[in-house]
């Protein structure tokens, strides 16, 4: 059910992936105006950006209650991030775990830059809420996905911009099975199918084969996580509902 008491508009970080697409739907269920924001930073899996418009069009077409709420889309060239990053997300190198215990898919500063730019755009657009798909339940250990990081960043943004912006991370405490379940709660099987077919997660950008859980190579950490979560979701292994 759409909340009619929503007063604040939201800006959603939308990459074209499963998590961020679920966050767009989550925001559409809550706010009268929802805009989306993507970043081109030279990511190896740039195909995800090409999925964004298809997802937006499907949300407008297949979910009439959300259609009028989905507003403008913004795309930011952040190639400087790719230029200063030497990671498996921005270079064609083998995905592996670095000496510090983090996978070499970690892009230092990425979410910090994303949220800072998003806050500046939201300030200009009169939007008070920023929504991101960060999660520290099923995740790769990225420090900029942690709840503490997001809370600290919210404080810094409000101090630095003399405003009152709220950072919402609806997936923070959900595993991937619960994220699929949340999509079903928000938009039924139609939204689950949209996310399965239209979004992209694979780190290497493979989009040649459609698996039960979506497109991807099936071998990279992102594909394995998405596959495992989808299979658990289908089996109903999470008996508690994902919190709306």
Curated annotation (Swiss-Prot):
Pathway: Purine metabolism; 7-cyano-7-deazaguanine biosynthesis
GO biological process, one term: queuosine biosynthetic process
Residues holding ATP: 14-24
Family matches, as CDD domains: QueC-like
Superkingdom assignment: Bacteria
Pfam families given in the database record: QueC
Family listed: Belongs to the QueC family.
Function: Catalyzes the ATP-dependent conversion of 7-carboxy-7-deazaguanine (CDG) to 7-cyano-7-deazaguanine (preQ(0)).
Protein name as annotated: 7-cyano-7-deazaguanine synthase
Species in which this protein is naturally found: Burkholderia lata (strain ATCC 17760 / DSM 23089 / LMG 22485 / NCIMB 9086 / R18194 / 383)
């Amino acid at each position: 059910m759409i909340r009619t008491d929503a007063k604040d508009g939201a800006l959603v970080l939308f990459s074209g992936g499963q998590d961020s697409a679920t966050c767009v739907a989550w925001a559409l269920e809550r706010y009268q105006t929802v805009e989306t924001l993507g970043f081109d930073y030279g990511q190896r899996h740039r195909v995800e950006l090409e999925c964004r418009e298809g997802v937006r069009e499907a949300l407008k077409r297949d979910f009439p209650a959300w259609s009028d709420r989905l507003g403008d889309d913004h795309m930011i060239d952040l190639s400087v991030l790719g230029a200063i990053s030497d990671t498996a997300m921005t270079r064609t190198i083998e995905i592996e775990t670095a000496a510090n215990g983090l996978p070499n898919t970690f892009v230092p500063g990425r979410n910090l830059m994303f949220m800072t730019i998003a806050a500046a755009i939201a300030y200009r657009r009169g939007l008070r809420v920023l929504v991101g798909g960060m999660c520290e339940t099923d995740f790769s250990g990225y420090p900029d996905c942690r709840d503490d990081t997001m809370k600290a960043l919210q404080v810094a943004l409000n101090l630095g911009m003399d405003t009152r912006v709220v950072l919402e991370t609806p997936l923070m405490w959900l595993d991937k099975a619960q994220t699929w379940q949340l999509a079903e709660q928000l938009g039924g099987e139609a939204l689950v199918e949209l996310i399965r077919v239209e979004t992209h997660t694979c780190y290497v950008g493979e989009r040649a084969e459609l698996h039960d859980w979506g497109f991807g190579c099936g071998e990279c950490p992102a594909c394995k996580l998405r596959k495992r979560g989808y299979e658990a979701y289908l089996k109903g292994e999470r008996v508690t509902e994902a919190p709306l």
